[in-house]
Amino acid sequence: MSNINKDALYDKVYGCWIGKSIGGTLGTPFEGRRELLDVTDFQTQSGRPLPNDDLDLQLIWLKALEDYGPLGVNEHVLGEYWINYIPPHWNEYGIGKSNMKTGLLPPLSGDFENGWKHSNGAWIRSEIWACCTPGCPEAATKYAWYDACVDHGTGEGTYAELFTASLESAAFVESDRDKLIQIGLSYIPGECRVAKSVQIALDGYKNGLDWKETRRRVLEDSADLGWFQAPANVAFVIIGWLYGEGDFKKSLLTAVSCGDDTDCTGATLGSILGIIYGAKALPADWKKHVGDEIITIAIDRGSWWNIPASCTDLTNRVMNMTPQVLASHNSGIGIGSGDTEPVNADNLAASHKYLNWLAEMNNSIQYDFIHSAVNIFYPEGVNISAGQEMPISITVYNKLPDPRHLEITYMLPDGFELIEGRKHLNLLHDTGVTSGKYEFTVRVRAGASVQAHNRGVMQMVAQGRPTVILAPILFLG
């Protein structure tokens, strides 16, 4: 088992939150300004931070971990916590919540008619997953998927959070900037727009361009996406990191001077460098400027009273949770008094198993029924008209070591007709020779009229098993 020194970890976790507070407070006054800026210092009075939803949402995710435990948190839990604890309806936040309220579960909640799914709302809240999985980026990235898909579906906003979460988790055990960026890139598709924008930033720096020209090239490539979008703003973080040349202040000032979603770029780069350097190494005057307090803006305080009041409080709560998360994921990482042991950067990159998992996530809805798991995917969407025939792709996974037969019943919406669909399947176990996975297609036809919400259920009964699979099906008229 690899060891991370407990005191060093505490300093890095605290550095993450203080760094985020510094960067968010530095960048917030310039948020939304798209022109090239010349930021030289804070615009606020010293002693308190500005509130920032980038941090607020992570306090809710910590509550979910504390309430449900490391293995109980998934996109369904986080979706329900969105509705209960996060009031704002800004951009993708509002669309994701509205879609869930109409019955669309994640990741459909983040995909359906969401013009903001490529935006910045997810990657700005990835640090909680990294801090709870230090040196274990694969686990961090799976949590990031559960998080991001709620309001970004399979958009670039989700890929952006996979990138930052993996990079930040790895930063607890690897401090080399270039290696960390490559680790982050390994967790997202090479052809996605986030990866392309990051590569433009890397190429500009490598080829000796100044940061302003590199920024211009990033903006030119992302012009079709518009403002407040993840690819360009993640690249601004990378520009600040590259051209800051190891200097905390210069790095954040450069990132914020790129403009656009400046509180997000400053806060995320501040947290990354806070993890790498630790809180003790951050500039004393900037730490003093923001203090230790957490001021919230996006949490329903009437529903939750035990909110961390300071970065110290937050760090202590994270430190209590982290050993549980690492153990739950069989990470092979322990936290103790000995020195932090070096880790080969190659071992931090995405595995083939992770990449296969990411491909299977796609935009299918996941259901876990203990002995089996079911994924439901609507290849032609969820909108349906009277008389229209629509396919549903079903994948069933065996989660236990025995094979089993499943009897399938379809309880369709009124007037709907089953055109195609298995009534029985033999779900084998995964032995290396046989696969514990079964895929099939269901086709339904709507009746002469449809309702606004057309709800059905696919029931699967496993012989000799008490748990009945009840997977909801929904079409919108």
Show the residue positions of the predicted features.
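An N-terminal structural lobe/cap that precedes and organizes the functional/catalytic core
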Residues: S2-K63, V77-L78
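Accessory "access/gating" subregions that flank catalytic or transport cores
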Residues: L9, M100, L108-K117, I128-C136, ...
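Catalytic phosphate/nucleotide-handling subdomain of diverse soluble enzymes
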Residues: I22, L26, L37, T164, ...
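A structural-propensity feature for long, helix-poor, extended segments
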Residues: Q45-W61, D67, I294-L326
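Short beta-strand elements of extracellular/lumenal beta-sandwich folds
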Residues: A386-L400
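Short acidic, flexible loop segments centered on an aromatic residue
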Residues: D402-G415
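Short, surface-exposed loop/turn segments at beta-strand-coil junctions that are enriched for proline
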Residues: L428-D430, R443-Q451
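Terminal connector regions
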Residues: G447-G477
